[in-house]
Structures are given as structure tokens and as C-alpha cells.
């Protein structure tokens, strides 16, 4: 090939500098700060792995978690009965400072054998332990839960509440050790879609929103040293949870998730 003329060489160098930089797929796929990114591709469960009580990590028993019509659906039609098989669908990456948006709805009837409290009950677990460290018969990961509840047609039943398997929080300036506390949301009956969000600032403040309205706020999510599973996760006497995995729940009532989006926030 002949050598480039000086004008051609300058043109080639200019074009090369103007070309967009091609990033490795792993870097290009990472959520960018201050931008909403979908964690669900609308086609399959790529990036997500189930852990169901009594089954090995990765065993999607009974096709519990499936994708149909661009929606993550939690179903129990292949179960004889629920039998305490609580499930969690884990996303592959850990997060620390972020805002998570989930659109969900409850449908159909509860699986036979499901506990009464789990009727129209699901949620998102965050600051989760590594699912690979969970016991085979462990019902819930050590985590904080944004608990989703559907109305029962009578009375008040708030959603995007807080529950704390193996953890505690600081609420109104005091260590809060009961398992759950309610938000101040409205009750959502029927099979309507509901938008729930959580804003997490590492081991600092956590806020819960429903349909854009702030319904709960607390701080300092931390391991409970009295919990057997949490105790194994404590290192150097540090209890505060700075980061963790995210998971979607299966608690015996059919539920659907059509949007799971995250916005990574600056620390």
C-alpha cells in the first residue's frame, strides 16, 4: 500500500480521534450515575438467579420465576402446595447508593399451603447477603425488605413497608428491632399496577416512595448480632450495611413485575 499523502494522513487521524470509543461489554452494561437503567431486559431472566428455600442456588423450582409478555411473573401452577418454599430472584450485581423503581401487581389466588400473612404479599429485598452464602433451607436472605402488600378489599393495608430479616434499622433516632413497620401509604386493592421506589444511601438514609409520594424514612441499616445468619456475616465488629444485592420475592401469592429500574447515585 502506498504511503498516505500528508493531507490524507491528517484526515485519517482526525477521523480516528472523532470515532466513539468502544467499551468492553461489561463496562458498557454497568448502570451509569444519575441515569435510569433497566435491570430487566423484557425478554428473559439474564442477569437474575433464583434461590428458593429447600433448593440449591440457581434452581428455579417449578418455573417459579418466568418471563411472559415482557413481564417477570411469579407463579405456582407447578407446585402441589407451597410448603414453605419462599423464593428470591437475585440480580447479579451489588449496589450501594441508588434509587430503585419497581412496578408490580398481585393477581389470582394464593398457592395452596401458603401462610395467611403472605396473601397478596411480596417485596424487594436490598442490601442482601451474597445468595451463594445462604443456607439451603434459609427462608429469607439477611437484608432489608421493601414489603409490598395488596389490599384485601376491606380495611387499611399499606404497602412499601419495611421488614428486617436478620437486620435492624434506626427509626426516629432510635434502634428499631421489631421485624416490620408500616409505611403511611394508601391501600391498593385489586390487580392495579403500583409504582414503588426506594432511595438508598449506603449505610445512611433510606426512603420509601409509592406513586411518587414519600411514605417512610429511616437510616443506618445494620446486621442484627442476635440473628444466627447475620452473625456469620459480621466482620471486624462492623454492623452497618453499606451495600448488597437486590432480589424480588416469591412468598406464595402470584405477583408480576413489569419494570425494575435503577439510578445509581453519587456518594
PLM-predicted stretches and their roles:
Residues 25-267:
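Carbohydrate-interacting regions of secretory-pathway proteins
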Amino acid at each position: 500500500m502506498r504511503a498516505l499523502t500528508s493531507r490524507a494522513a491528517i484526515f485519517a487521524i482526525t477521523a480516528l480521534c472523532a470515532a466513539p470509543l468502544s467499551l468492553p461489554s461489561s463496562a458498557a452494561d454497568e448502570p451509569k450515575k444519575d441515569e435510569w437503567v433497566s435491570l430487566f431486559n423484557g425478554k428473559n431472566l439474564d442477569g437474575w438467579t433464583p434461590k428458593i428455600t429447600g433448593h440449591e442456588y440457581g434452581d428455579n423450582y417449578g418455573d417459579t420465576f418466568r418471563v411472559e409478555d415482557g413481564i417477570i411473573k411469579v407463579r405456582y401452577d407447578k407446585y402441589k402446595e407451597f410448603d414453605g418454599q419462599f423464593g428470591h430472584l437475585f440480580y447479579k450485581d451489588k449496589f450501594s447508593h441508588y434509587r430503585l423503581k419497581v412496578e408490580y401487581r398481585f393477581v389470582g389466588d394464593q398457592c395452596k399451603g401458603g401462610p395467611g400473612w403472605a396473601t397478596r404479599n411480596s417485596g424487594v429485598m436490598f442490601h442482601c447477603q451474597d445468595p451463594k452464602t445462604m443456607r439451603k433451607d434459609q427462608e429469607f436472605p439477611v437484608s432489608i425488605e421493601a414489603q409490598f402488600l395488596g389490599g384485601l378489599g376491606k380495611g387499611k393495608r399499606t404497602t412499601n413497608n419495611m421488614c428486617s430479616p436478620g437486620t435492624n434499622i434506626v427509626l426516629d433516632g432510635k434502634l428499631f428491632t421489631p421485624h416490620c413497620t408500616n409505611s403511611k401509604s394508601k391501600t391498593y386493592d385489586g390487580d392495579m399496577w403500583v409504582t414503588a421506589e426506594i432511595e438508598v444511601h449506603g449505610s445512611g438514609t433510606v426512603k420509601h416512595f409509592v406513586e411518587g409520594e414519600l411514605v417512610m424514612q429511616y437510616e443506618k441499616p445494620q446486621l442484627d448480632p442476635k440473628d444466627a445468619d447475620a452473625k456469620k456475616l459480621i466482620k471486624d465488629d462492623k454492623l452497618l450495611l453499606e451495600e448488597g444485592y437486590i432480589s424480588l420475592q416469591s412468598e406464595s401469592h402470584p405477583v408480576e413485575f413489569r419494570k425494575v429500574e435503577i439510578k445509581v447515585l453519587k456518594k
